[in-house]
Amino acid sequence: MHNDTKAMDFNRKAKVAISERDSIDGWPCCVYCGAASPAPLAWSNAHFISRGQGGLGVPENGLTLCPVCHRRYDQSDERERMRDFFREYLQHCYEEWSEDALIYRKGGNDD
């Protein structure tokens, strides 16, 4: 697996962090519609900034989305409205959240 591909995948540690962050009463739920996940790590795999745009596989770029909301985010004309909602959600979760820090850069992201 190439380093860039690895950097954009959510590893188990990231999936657990996303799942815990997006939980209600200890159970992961879709952050958009509120549906409960069928299993603890089943839905912790949506990128705020897509892999195709270089989005990193880090919790700050991850969202728990049900399959319906994930498809709507990836493939519908609702993307911009949903993206605004997710941006506010992630900014609320992480004090120093920045979209620029979520994009893979060859050679590292600490510049």
Kindly give the residue locations of the regions a language model identified.
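A broad structural signal for alpha-helix termini and local helix breaks/kinks
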Residues: 22-25, 37, 94
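Polybasic, low-complexity binding patches
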Residues: 2, 52-64, 71-111
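Detector for the c-type heme attachment site
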Residues: 35-36, 70-72
